[in-house]
Amino acid sequence: MSIGYDSAKVPAPTALADLLKAEYKGKVALNGDPTRANAALNGVMMASVANGGSLDDISKGVDFFKQLKSSGNFIPVQASTATIKNGTTQVVLDWDYLSAGAVKNVPTWKVFVPDNAVLGGYYAQAINKEAPHPAAARLWQEYLYSDAGQNLWLKGGARPVRMDAMTKAGTVDKA
């Protein structure tokens, strides 16, 4: 998870707590409703971790968003490419790889991952035991977790699950 922001319109945050400051009034949004959207729920979970809470008890994240709302800093607008581009959502809590994509439309868009709120989520991969071609499914899995497959995730802006091992092995593609 990350904090994406338009550096031409708001100061660079150095911590999640910065979003409670007056200069962020009416500018902070989530990518959806946390009761319905995984990215938004993970924004609340990130706030929980940043505020000394946990993933098992996200009440500190809920409290953080109550503070954001009562200060007038949180806006109940679902962040999207369009709202970032038109300036409605100048600060967005979202997956870093999704937020990084906003740079295409807003060159001053920056992405920040707070040190005290590092939170990741990975896609689950499975092979159905009833698959018509289980060997092909296994080969696909093998490819996804190969250096080549992981570098494709990286090219798409995601952080591959094997990135640390690939960095040590020198197999991460150079940008």
Task: For the regions a language model picked out, list residue spans one by one.
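Periplasmic-binding protein-like
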Residues: 62-67, 73, 106-129, 165-167, ...
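Mature extracytoplasmic/periplasmic domains
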Residues: 119, 123, 128-174
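Extracytoplasmic ligand-binding site segments that recognize negatively charged/polar headgroups
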Residues: 1-88
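Short secondary-structure boundary segments
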Residues: 7, 32, 96-97, 156-157
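Alpha-helix capping/helix-boundary segments
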Residues: 80, 97-99, 149
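A ligand-binding cleft/hinge motif common to bilobed small-molecule-binding domains
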Residues: 85, 90-108
